[in-house]
From Swiss-Prot:
Modification comment: N-glycosylated.
Stated role: Catalyzes the removal of terminal sialic acid residues from viral and cellular glycoconjugates. Cleaves off the terminal sialic acids on the glycosylated HA during virus budding to facilitate virus release. Additionally helps virus spread through the circulation by further removing sialic acids from the cell surface. These cleavages prevent self-aggregation and ensure the efficient spread of the progeny virus from cell to cell. Otherwise, infection would be limited to one round of replication.
Residue ranges, annotated region (Head of neuraminidase): 89-470
Protein name: Neuraminidase
Name of the gene: NA
Residue spans, topological domain Virion surface: 36-470
Binding site for substrate: R116, R150, E275, E276, R291, R368
Stated family: Belongs to the glycosyl hydrolase 34 family.
Misc. comment: The influenza A genome consist of 8 RNA segments. Genetic variation of hemagglutinin and/or neuraminidase genes results in the emergence of new influenza strains. The mechanism of variation can be the result of point mutations or the result of genetic reassortment between segments of two different strains.
Source organism of this protein record: Influenza A virus (strain A/Turkey/Minnesota/501/1978 H6N8)
Glycosylation (residues): N46, N54, N84, N144, N293, N398
Required cofactor(s): Ca(2+)
Record remark: domains: Intact N-terminus is essential for virion morphogenesis. Possesses two apical sorting signals, one in the ectodomain, which is likely to be a glycan, and the other in the transmembrane domain. The transmembrane domain also plays a role in lipid raft association.
Cystines in this chain: C90-C417, C122-C127, C182-C229, C231-C236, C277-C290, C279-C288, C316-C335, C421-C446
TM segment ranges: 15-35
Amino acid sequence: MNPNQKIITIGSVSLGLVVLNILLHIVSITITVLVLPGNGNSGNCNETIIREYNETVRIEKVTQRHNTNVIEYIERPESDHFMNNTEPLCDAKGFAPFSKDNGIRIGSRGHIFVIREPFVSCSPTECRTFFLTQGSLLNDKHSNGTVKDRSPYRTLMSVEIGQSPNVYQARFEAVAWSATACHDGKKWMTIGVTGPDAKAVAVVHYGGIPTDVINSWAGNILRTQESSCTCIQGECYWVMTDGPANRQAQYRVFKAKQGKIIGQTEISFNGGHIEECSCYPNEGKVECVCRDNWTGTNRPVLVISSDLSYRVGYLCAGLPSDTPRGEDSQFTGSCTSPMGNQGYGVKGFGFRQGNDVWMGRTISRTSRSGFEILKIRNGWTQNSKEQIKKQVVVDNLNWSGYSGSFTLPVELTKRNCLVPCFWVEMIRGKPEEKTIWTSSSSIVMCGVEHEIADWSWHDGAILPFDIDKM
């Protein structure tokens, strides 16, 4: 066979294969379009597939048309009812670890926000850790000077509980240097306070959208709880302060429904001081244990009813729970007046258990170090010093900080009572340590029906960081 014949033969074979391939495709399309629909099949294969991406559930509806996938992203369905939250608190014999974020340890090499004032709040399906960022990362030059409380860079963000406050999983909530947040059963409501000291504004967000505002009424650093607000049957309550931190200020309770303020009342508390309340629902009322930054080493107590009537006083227990404070033996306690004659203070919490009270406090009397929780017999109603139980959460060799309360709703636990929980902030850096920054991590504990051994779940980061050595 000469070269020309070889070329003709190869070309003929190739052309034949191409024609055969085309015929096969025509037959395949004919069977798919004409035969299958004739058997009562629409030609579409519809199914909903649930896949997990980056620890967030995303629902995909996949429609197959003639070997082509059409993917539609469906938003997670919202609950159609409000949480009740009128149940009593569960009785707690001890508190077990729920989560620990280790944010500062991870932040020596990870992309972790510089934060303060972390707190936890829960919806019917999840609990989230909220925190106030400084608009900067750990081990970065912008972390310099973040000991400052108020700046235009501070924002409220959140992650699923247990996650570190990292840039990849954090969700923006509000521009804020003071904040609170809670879920009514349908959507998250957040309140972020920002702006100049004399004319600060609190912006209410509902479902991520700004829905209302509160302007400063006393012109002196409008501020709020730095912990979870409280929703009962769709109505959410929170406490705000405006005025001096070291003498008489002004205090108000607000009520909102679906992000719109529907009521407010001024708290008359002459001679007393209320800041940074830690609140929780209990038997249809909101119970708050707050901070007296003026004189008292006992904590203010505020009980709010649905009509915004209230009872205000001090935690009766004969042991102080603020810091700094004097000796336990020298403290007598009062249900109505500040005791101890110590200025300054730290955010804290307590839980009523009948007439008894669980109250948290730093172990140190003079600094924010160590943390313990005590159960005082009749401490909610009397000046009792009788400790029923004590549990150490952070030993006195390690730094602590703010602490606050929240509850696990019955939708999460399937119980007939609300589980009492608390978090402890562990502040690192300035002013106690030689760094250019101030930040914190947290440990979260929840009430259980068993006693829990003492231990120290402290922060554990080794300081200084590289940025501090430059």
